[in-house]
């Protein structure tokens, strides 16, 4: 193995609820030349911890952990479980809080709807919260979001929602996470609003905060170039 290959960064990308690797299509294209990219398996596991532990079992050495939404919970858990292995932490369109009881009930209602044979109706119902108003007018973008949800399917949707409901509040862990970190959020994100990103950034010791104008929850798809640039900057900091 050449010295260059031996020193290549590893980049772990964790998708969000109802999302596949296509969530990071543009970032994979932009960054694959400088990092070995691994996509977290979020299917069929009933806890965020199980998703994170599988990553630690399957990947050797140090890596930069990036997650969007539910994937952010996985990235945070990786940093908490194995801080010595996480060279950089990227938290996109996510938060460090546990679900409130009201949010858990909303998730239970969506699970119930999906089990009544109405799974195809779940994602269109969520679209106004996943994309900005401008993003909702982009037919190609909407088609990609719907295709990801169909690929995930009802059973995995249920297990992912259960994992999200069971996650821990990680805000108390943030001040101990000393690795270079990035917190990024769209200013039009109603699922994980910018205030939550600002709180996380204020608690992380070595954090860059980026808020993107006119962007909703699925920031990596709505603002691919800006997100790729932010991740490239995080890789630079992690490699320094």
Task: Set out the residue ranges of the language-model regions.
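Acidic beta-to-alpha connecting loop that harbors the catalytic carboxylate
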Residues: 16-17, 187-189, 214-216
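Short beta-strand/loop motif that positions the catalytic acidic residue
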Residues: 177, 183-185, 189
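Gly/Ala-rich beta-loop-alpha elbow adjacent to hydrolase catalytic centers
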Residues: 67-71, 75
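Conserved HGGG/HGGXW glycine-rich cap/lid loop of the alpha/beta-hydrolase fold
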Residues: 2-54, 68
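Catalytic histidine neighborhood in serine/cysteine hydrolases
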Residues: 194, 198-217
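Conserved alpha/beta-hydrolase catalytic His-Asp/Glu region
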Residues: 99-102, 117-176
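Catalytic histidine-centered segment of alpha/beta-hydrolase-like enzymes
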Residues: 215-228
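Flexible "cap/lid" loop of the alpha/beta hydrolase fold
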Residues: 48, 80-81, 85-124, 129
């Amino acid at each position: 193995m050449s010295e260059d290959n031996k020193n290549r960064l590893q980049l772990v990308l964790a998708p969000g609820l109802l999302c596949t690797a296509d969530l990071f299509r543009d970032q994979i294209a932009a960054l694959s030349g400088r990092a070995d990219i691994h996509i977290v398996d979020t299917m069929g596991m009933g806890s965020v911890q199980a998703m994170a532990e599988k990553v630690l079992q399957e990947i050797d050495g140090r890596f930069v952990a990036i997650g969007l939404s539910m994937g952010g919970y996985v990235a945070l858990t990786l940093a908490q479980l194995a801080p010595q292995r996480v060279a950089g932490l990227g938290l996109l369109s996510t938060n460090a809080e546990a679900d409130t009881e009201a949010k858990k009930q909303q998730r239970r209602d969506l699970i119930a709807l999906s089990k009544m044979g109405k799974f195809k109706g779940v994602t269109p119902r969520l679209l106004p919260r996943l994309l900005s108003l401008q993003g909702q007018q982009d037919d190609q973008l909407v088609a990609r979001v719907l295709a990801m949800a169909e690929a995930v399917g009802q059973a995995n949707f249920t297990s992912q929602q259960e994992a999200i409901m069971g996650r821990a509040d990680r805000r108390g862990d943030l001040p101990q996470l000393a690795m270079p970190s990035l917190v990024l959020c769209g200013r039009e994100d109603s699922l994980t609003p910018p205030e939550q990103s600002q709180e996380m950034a204020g608690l992380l010791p070595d954090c860059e905060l980026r808020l993107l104008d006119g962007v909703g929850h699925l920031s990596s798809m709505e603002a691919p170039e800006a997100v790729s640039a932010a991740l490239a900057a995080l890789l630079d900091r992690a490699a320094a």
